[in-house]
Regions:
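Signature for the C-terminal beta-barrel architecture of outer-membrane proteins
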Residues: 223-226, 234-422, 483-485, 492-493, ...
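C-terminal structural cap/anchor segments
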Residues: 411, 415-526
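N-terminal periplasmic/intermembrane-space "pro-region" immediately following the signal or transit peptide
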Residues: 23-168, 175, 400, 404, ...
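Extracytoplasmic loops and strand-loop junctions of Gram-negative outer membrane beta-barrel proteins
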Residues: 93-95, 132-143, 192-197, 234-236, ...
């Protein structure tokens, strides 16, 4: 009896072992998974299998769906998804580079834009002998002018690569611009030296502003560092704020980066095309006599502190002798002032600039020194050596939706225009975004110097360089120089509206050049106050529709009054609308 329970116990254990399922062994399990498990497992890509083991027929089940490429995966039919259209620039569009047109990595981006400017301005304007009105006894006449300028641009960009961070393998781009402009003034001999042309001018131009090919020579690291070359008509800016050379012109550029994009470099050469006088666009011919520009620069990110990018550069400009009238029949080269003869010049700029943040303070700085030689400066009446410099600094601080800022700009002036050294700073072809940029009265307008054929300051420049024209004239390093002190604030009023307010005080550095040209012994340094405001409006929070509104008032100082014999305030107001597809 005592052995019977023990026999029953061993019999129960034996039956349980025989009837139990096989033990689970985790990752060592070799049995095939059931249907539910198989659906949860990731599918191995077929291309990873050896050629001999590839199945002839693809599996026919719900887990395998062939796609042409990753760009054409059809999204679910949710209400948030918008069906694409070739006329819709906002959503996925094969014509906007969102989808490849060939294979998996060749894209085409077509764009079109209309840019319309309407500008009312007041500029000191001489009243000549053949006046437009009777009873114009005074030297200066009516200052009012109206400018309407319209550009229509068509662009095609074909490239191989990815649309994100990977550099292009190759690229072709072209941009064609058609221009129509209209100018109305109140005095004769402004639109043309022939007074019979009257006080209005309507003109047009067609230009190729971009036409280049780009090719990636080599990948320099697994982190998408690269070396590329670009040849043709191409845009280029030699520094952060456009102080020295900013243009879209004919050239060759070698560029790239290394150290995971912490270092970038450019080596560029330009043989500049002639510019159209009234539109500023490229003409279909090289500059008469020739002007070549060579630029080498190097950028370093997070140096010497995190958030700050520093740049060093060397830029060389060589101008040959030439004789050139602009489209309005005014003499552009050589500058029609002093002892003007055809002359050549060479200058080398050594620059150090920076842009970024130090802690929470935004910092922009620049310093340039230029040296060279001019074979016959018209103001000096002789050959001169060039020695001049420029400095700029902007500090700003972001606090919520406000950015208050303070800026200073300095360009050296020449205190002895008759000696053999030219000490007034001049650029190659500048377009500075500084101390108010295009909203500034001083930066936006060309102010003609009384009784000469040169401008005190040119449109799109801060420098009182006494050139006939920034686009078609020659650099002139005998000039008065300038101090500019700026106080401003940028206000993000709403996500679509930005307000920019600036107050600039301007003063000449040296007066001897102006006194020599104007035969005036008494000219004071104070140029005046430039008060300007601008609004940028983007109704859709993108760049497809952008409207700019600007207004500036110039309060003449004692020096400006000495030159132009008036202390009346001058005004400018403009609106600029850009529509882009």
């Amino acid at each position: 009896m005592r052995g019977r329970p023990l026999k029953f116990f061993f019999a129960f254990i034996l039956v349980a072992v025989v009837l139990s399922p096989p033990a689970q062994t985790g990752r060592a399990q070799t049995s095939e998974p059931d249907e539910d498990q198989r659906k949860r497992l990731p599918l191995r890509p077929l291309y990873s299998m050896p050629e001999a083991f590839r199945p002839e027929d693809k599996p026919e089940d719900a887990d395998f769906q062939p796609y042409t490429d990753r760009w054409r995966i059809t999204p679910p039919e949710y209400e948030v998804n918008v069906r694409s259209s070739r006329w819709d620039p906002y959503n996925q569009n094969i014509l906007k580079g969102d989808l490849p047109i060939l294979g998996n990595d060749i894209f085409l981006n077509l764009s079109a834009s209309i840019d319309t400017l309407v500008e009312f301005r007041q500029v000191p304007t001489p009243c000549g002998v053949s006046a437009a009105r009777p009873f114009c006894e005074e030297f200066f006449g009516k200052p009012e002018q109206l400018l309407v300028n319209n550009n229509v641009a068509l662009s095609a960009d074909l490239f191989k690569g990815l649309t994100a961070f990977k550099p292009f393998d190759w690229r072709f781009k072209t941009t064609f611009i058609g221009n129509v402009n209209y100018l109305r003034v109140r005095e004769n001999a402004i639109v043309n030296p022939d007074v019979r042309r009257g006080t209005t001018r309507t003109d047009g131009a067609a230009a190729v502003q971009e036409l280049f090919a780009e090719y990636k020579i080599a990948d320099l690291s697994p982190n998408f560092d690269f070396l590329s070359i670009r040849a043709g008509i191409q845009p280029f800016n030699s520094d952060f704020r456009g102080f020295i050379f900013t243009d879209s012109n004919l050239g060759v550029r070698l560029f790239g980066n290394f150290e995971s994009n912490r270092s970038q470099f450019n080596l560029a050469y330009f043989d500049r095309l002639e510019k159209d006088t009234n539109s500023g666009l490229n003409r279909f011919k090289t500059r008469a006599g020739g002007q070549s520009v060579l630029v080498a620069n190097y950028y370093r990110q997070d140096f010497p502190v995190l958030g700050l990018t520093e740049q060093v550069s060397v830029q060389r400009v060589a101008e040959s002798k030439s004789f050139h009238f602009d489209n309005n029949d005014f003499l552009a080269r050589p500058d029609p002032v002093g002892d003007f003869n055809r002359h050549s010049s060479k200058a080398i700029y050594f620059g150090w600039t920076g842009s970024g943040k130090i802690d929470r303070v935004n910092v922009e700085h620049a310093f340039y020194f230029v040296k060279g030689h001019d074979s016959h400066n018209p103001i000096a009446g002789r050959d001169v050596d060039i020695r001049a410099y420029m400095a700029a600094l902007e500090l700003s601080y972001d606090r919520d939706w406000l950015r208050p800022k303070v800026s200073y700009f300095f360009a050296s002036g020449d205190g002895n225009p008759r000696d053999r050294t030219a000490r007034g700073f001049d650029s190659i072809f500048d377009n500075p975004n500084f101390v108010g940029g295009g909203f500034s009265f001083w930066n936006r307008l060309a102010v003609k110097l009384t009784g000469t054929g040169v401008n005190l300051v040119n449109r799109g420049s801060l420098l009182p360089d006494l050139r006939s024209s920034k686009e078609e004239g020659q650099p002139n390093f005998i000039n008065p120089g300038i101090h500019i002190v700026n106080f401003g604030v940028d206000v993000e009023v709403t996500p679509t509206v930005k307000l920019l307010l600036n107050a600039n005080y301007l003063e000449f550095v040296k007066l001897e050049t102006l006194q020599l040209l104007l035969f005036q012994s008494k000219i004071r340094k104070q140029i005046g106050w430039d008060l300007n405001a601008g609004i940028r409006y983007r109704p859709f929070n993108n760049n497809n529709v952008i409207a700019f509104f600007g207004f500036a008032t110039f309060l003449p100082g004692k020096g400006f009054k000495d030159i132009f014999e008036s202390s009346k305030p001058l005004h400018i107001g403009f609106t600029n609308l850009t529509l882009t597809f």
